[in-house]
């Protein structure tokens, strides 16, 4: 459509017989579609539809034969339809949509768990797989350029097994083979420009992984990536985050290229170097902490390109615990994502008396929060494991004492178990919550605020450091209210891991008592809902409440105590009638559109690279995609 009208949408309005308002509604949809790389929100996993009628969309499509053909092909997938379950990503057996389980509407949650657990027992990692149900069993589709990699190149020599119930499990290579082949080719070309041996090894292992489907090769690429310290241009690619798989273990493809912001990185560097003195301030003893804090790379980046369904504000990867515990990890704060603002952005739920402080300090408060979340949040803690039969990474004769019970621990990770396999679909949100709570606890340390340029390191709620701390707590409380947008009353499930976590932290603030935090309103419909948070009580009421919650989150994770963790987390993230019937409705009325990011393109001309930027508008978003090459 864009090519047909050459970007002149007022002309296409006349051609299609539509008003400019109707065309603008289509453009809003198109920009959101491109920003989320699909018609389900990347942050919320619910379907969004155009605000124009199907007949109006068809009128737009009739302007050319090509657009009409595409419309006829996809028209049934664009709008809501009668099947409400299809409005959400989730398990197919619950009536939801998931492309991780293609052509398998009858595959059950138990079958997915059974196949996944079986493959885990064989040592096959799941991130680059999908599962398809067949008459006699299951096909496990492995993303790879080759449809028949040699047994030596595969992670498992065998590729077919029979389960106890007689059903067959077969590995089928070559999923997304065209895309994986193109990606591997470009990775091999990029290797020619590697700056050092770590980058060369990284490219070689990427290529092996994308050609053969080997995630062991991908893990080697991530080890090399971690060891490549402080590059000027930072990049990583692969099946990394598992938020969108309803089972919580299969990855979504993403890749990014970004440049280092040296000034901001310096502040994060100070945080890295002083991290070992702050970890002991968290509410557990050394038994539940890594033997040695592996000092990670902590970099503030300006994103050039982030290819994926959504762009985070910070990243802490790789997610493989053995690499994290033995080689470390990288923390990345994405500065130009943190500070990006849409024109005339509204800030609901903040009192007028707090607004000036909030607007002035929300960016620095968020930067401190992201730094602590990524570095110390995801970076701290130890999983207590039986690493191989009879071998433990803790003193088994005198087991650690749980601060929750005052007794020796009774659970730990068994051989072959990982954090992800034990906690499953709970893992993503639970770990985000743990990291957020670490950040909320340690943002109360005034020497940390001084590292970022606020205050003199002494505890003082009345100076600029106090402003940043107060804003950080307000920001989290506000995020907890806004989170209700991402909870679905029909399925009674949370559509977004971070938002479920933030709601639980708001509940933790409120549980600390009205002396600390309270939701206030005068109107019956809560249209004037605001947060009252007592600045002077953060240190003596707010932080202890966070510490108590964080201690449970951490100890349950460290000891593989899934049952207690799930019971606690389900309870605190349960949306009670007051929140469902009143607060959520107020949130939806004040809902602000989710940001989509218009990204620049790079074009090579005669050996030189030209940067093309676009305006922050729907048209700019579409134009940027029109001028981009695709796999």
Where in the sequence are the language-model features?
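Alpha-helical packing segments of well-folded alpha/beta enzyme cores
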Residues: 183-187, 371, 438
